[in-house]
Amino acid sequence: LRNRVLVIAEIGINHLGDEKYCKKLIIEAIKSGADCVKLQIINPEESYEKETKSFSLFKKYRLNFESLKRINNFCKRKNILLFATPGDMHSLNIIKKLKFPIIKISSGLNTNKYLINQSLKLNLPMIISLGMTNESEIKKIYKFVKKKNKNFALLKCTSIYPSGDNE
C-alpha cells in the first residue's frame, strides 16, 4: 500500500450499535471501492462521566465483543481490512484480542502519551489524526512515535465543521 492511496470507509459508530447494519455499511464500503473500514470502539464507563451526552451516546451505540468478533470475521471473508480507533485502554485491549492490522489514534487522543505508548506496543501500522493540534504538538507527536514505530501516518484533518475557507 506504500505506493497508492488507502481508501478508508469511516463507519465510526454510525452502525448505531447494530451488527447487521454495520455489515450492511461494510458491504456499501466494498461496493464503493474502499480498501478498509474503520470503527470507533469506546468503553463509555471508562471514558465518560455517566451524566454526559457522550456517555449515553457511546453506551447506546456500542458493539459488544462478540459482535465485533463476528464483524471482524465477516470482513476477512469479504476481503476488506477492518481496524478501529480505541477510545480507552479497554478498547485497545479489544483491538489487540481481535488482531486488527492497523490502529488509528483520534484527534481527541493524539496527545495522550499513555494510550499512544500502549498502542505502539502492539507493533501495528498506526494512523494519527492531527485535528485540534498546533505545529508544536504535531512535532512532539511525530518525534514520540518515530522513536518507536517507523510505520505510521499523520493525517491533517479539520475538527470543526463547517471548515473555514482557509482550510
Where are these regions (language model features)?
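Catalytic cores and adjacent flexible loops of soluble metabolic enzymes
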Residues: 1-167
